[in-house]
């Protein structure tokens, strides 16, 4: 169904990524009515109808976004029509400057015109000018273009009148005449230059008919005949010319002020680094900036050895950007690709789907399919790419099809196993295909009553030379077969010898295939004898075995196998193994041949089946959901080494799917190799289409001698085509693409080579690039022009036409339903507000609650709040505090529902008794915690201090319609409980972990590339290695799960409406299933709960357990606690003793070197200043080069600099700006977008100081104040214990937060510890990560020691497995703190100790499993006093 104009506008808004910026009414009602395209001029004009004017800043955002999106395709313009033009006069004033910029006036005159006053009267716009000359000049120069500019913006304007203000005429006359004269001179100069440039370009094109583009051009033109391949550059040369495509670029400014550009280019023979410095008085820098990745350049210069990178580089003298001819699809009718692998085909496909889609669109293909191996993880990106490039997307997958149960016994006979006669046989052949290869040896033994009673062994003459592979495998030579009988004679004799015995073979389907084919060619028809396959029998009755090959089984059963792959020896070994298997079957109750399959079948039978590749194509939306179900089942229920699709599963969910035969690993291709045509045609009827792939892709089958030669391959194609014709299903040519272009194939080779067990390593990888229609037609030219066109073009297009438009991703949010959520959130909010503020609520509380509840309930967000409230309440009830993250603390409703402890109201007092309150709304107080202590004037009770002054808008947006993202920090040890509680709330089938996709990282790719080059004995320069690394980076390597993300499916839908499911990293033992799609793909469609694990709540819980102090009762403004953020005095130590000017070692958020330096620079004394520090330390370009300089120069102090994003909105509102403008400025600054002219003007009008504007312009990212406040609250509570309960603090810190210990140093005296710390500081730049982690622990230990406490050695009698324990004024470390000692060993020591004391080191080793190295460490530590090496035998032990 065609999209409506409104839907087209939504798609456009999504594509250019501004949906979230637009007003909801505009987004929902806007229409994209048409696009005028001029291929000749490369222009697109979008015609858009809107219900109202866009705000000026939104208009500029829209124009910029659409121009950027399509800049590589066309020059874009927009024409807007506004249906409701109310307030046209107000908008005209704001748009005036933009419209002037669309005229051809000089910059100076434009600037002057922008200062003019506007008057709008109906459809006439009056511009007040200073004099008649101005009026005439402007009217002549820009009237028409200015009207056009306004109309393009949607204004209904008939004319523009320039009117004079007589009072100003004379004053401005002289100035204007000078401007006009300057403009005329400049226009003449520009016209002359343009004419000369056109002449030069025309002359150049006549002399050198190339497609060079005059963009980057430095130095002299480079003669094309001088170009040489990069691979030929092997030593220093004076002057060399090359051309290549840029794949990396780095532009740096030097201390001298000059710039150097370093680009890496490749011509796909090799790669090279090119360098060039800017020259004096030249515009080289602008040319350098014109270069970008993907552009082709021609360069000339000197090749020299770069001593820094130790490689050859080119120092360029000349460079020019060129336009390189790209690969084209020249066919009039284009094909459709139905078999294609992206980077989501694990360690196999190379490009992302977007690259394929763009290429297909560039070639003019009407549609393209994606069929990754076993997964559909490219679907979300495929949808976005198809929408962007205007091409039909076909969604599919190449899966692994298995029969539900592989029979052990064929053609069941009513024969008692112990009484039966068996013929155990084996064939040796010229190849693997019973249709195209021949038997060269047939050997058998006859078994009865558990004994071999007869033998049969014959060679047969194949009348062809044996390949080296077969000779090496079977040890049969041509000479041995020269005088051998014909196969007809051998088989006739064999059939008579067998009689009615039961056939037994190892992998019987192979051997019986040759026997039955031979029988049929002799006219006997297929064998009617019963069959038993010992391979499948072993897989069933020996499930504990990981292998079931004949070699392996012979060893397990104690049977001698003297010469494997000679028929008679294999046969005898199989016979003796089978005799023992019959006894096993008897013990399992299997007594008759016809009972084998029934009694030995099990639900894991799918694991025994050999998978065949199958292509599944989604035909409609129902098919998409069914494919999601199939994918999920294959990954969760039927995963065995690889995801498997039982045929019964496919049959159950086949509706809406088209089933294809896939590649040479497919069932039908195998059938052509192993079965006669009637059986092939029978199998073909199961499928909806047959795939045949280019002969080049099957070359490895010929190389591996699985197919005899090209002639045989062509015969296989004919049989496949005939099967399609007979079955009445289309035969289509598919490319099985794994990368875009031929030169990308090296990346796939590298990835495959990195997987030692991958079967693709056994042969040369075929060329699997994305082929054009021309290339595919050429591949199948041997079929004749008509047939080639039919399978390549006609059938692929007709099949594509049968497929409906499918959308794999939802376009809106689906939240769970909880009965009465709206009412409960409202009631809970007011109930807790009344508990805190009294029955007669202050108006400020009512106003804030109503404002928030209107947004929360009105937009359907109450259920999200209620879920979070339930999770937090459960954790609190279980004794664990929860810290909030992000901006949820901006919501007062979240505070009143106990989701967060942060109170966002302005600072205020509350009386806990009579509930009187006092609010400070003028910005004079940064945090309620900073208010001075005060008693209630009414009842005398000490007042509660609250409020962080955070606007609600920073959480749900200015309109309150942004989906709430509630992130919660649970204790790390409680997190699994919180996760599992979601199953209680919603049901196990409604909650899943948020899935992630792990791709090959750059460092990993580097290892792959180096390994491949070393294995191949190839040397490449560094630039080429970098290129190969880039080619391998980003390919899917594994899957995983978000550390805390839980996806909640609403009760009225199921998970398959959104995504398939799987286990993370395919770990079938995982406790949770995850979304198959990366959670970012469905983030806007389903609710994601961020239930994160954090150390702070865990530490608070341990401190509470040790001290009995409720952390919520800890005073937040304790003076001694506040003191440690500027001096260590309250800890009773000096700066010199602990080598630090603050006392914040180990305090969350304030213990790192970077933040400690901030504390030294700012010396905070209040809670609000600590919040500032937290915001400053988490922001980007907020502290360094910004607030730090403002404080140092004395322009402002810590409390007044911009620290958190919310500060901007609050500050600007207090300064007098409208809340909407204050919000816009905050959002623009926090996203690093700076300030618009309108914002700057508004801020200046309200006397915002210049330093504040400058600070805003520097910021790239800002931290939410609510997040900072929550972090600081936790930090202050932990700091309280550090100051007032030191041993509780240190025990908790070392237990929860520390991981790397140097116990040898920690048990020493304080002077020794300090010296070690000081020494490590002196070597800091040379320390590794582990050493730096040890240093962090030693800093805390040094502080602890100087406070008078010490660390004991490990105690065999007292140490716990994981927790530091307090003994007097000391701590005893746990066993886990011993370097190299793991969790299981730590537990085992405690368990062994509980069973009795350790008698010796030998006893310790034996009982606890301690290594000699660990025992020696404990000995050095002094933990094994008087423990002998071996126990002495006592008379009492006798």
From Swiss-Prot:
Disulfide bonds: none annotated. It is found in: Cytoplasm. GO terms for biological process: DNA-templated DNA replication. Gene3D superfamilies: 1.10.150.870, 3.30.1900.20, 6.10.140.1510, Metal-dependent hydrolases (3.20.20.140), Nucleic acid-binding proteins (2.40.50.140), PolC, middle finger domain (1.10.150.700), Ribonuclease H-like superfamily/Ribonuclease H (3.30.420.10). One of its GO terms (molecular function) is 3'-5' exonuclease activity. Its main location: cytoplasm. Its EC number is 2.7.7.7. Keywords: Cytoplasm, DNA replication, DNA-directed DNA polymerase, Exonuclease, Hydrolase, Nuclease, Nucleotidyltransferase, Transferase. It catalyses: DNA(n) + a 2'-deoxyribonucleoside 5'-triphosphate = DNA(n+1) + diphosphate. It comes from the Bacteria. HAMAP family: DNApol_PolC. Belongs to the DNA polymerase type-C family. PolC subfamily. This is DNA polymerase III PolC-type. It comes from Staphylococcus aureus (strain MRSA252). The lineage of its organism: Bacteria, Bacillati, Bacillota, Bacilli, Bacillales. The gene is polC.
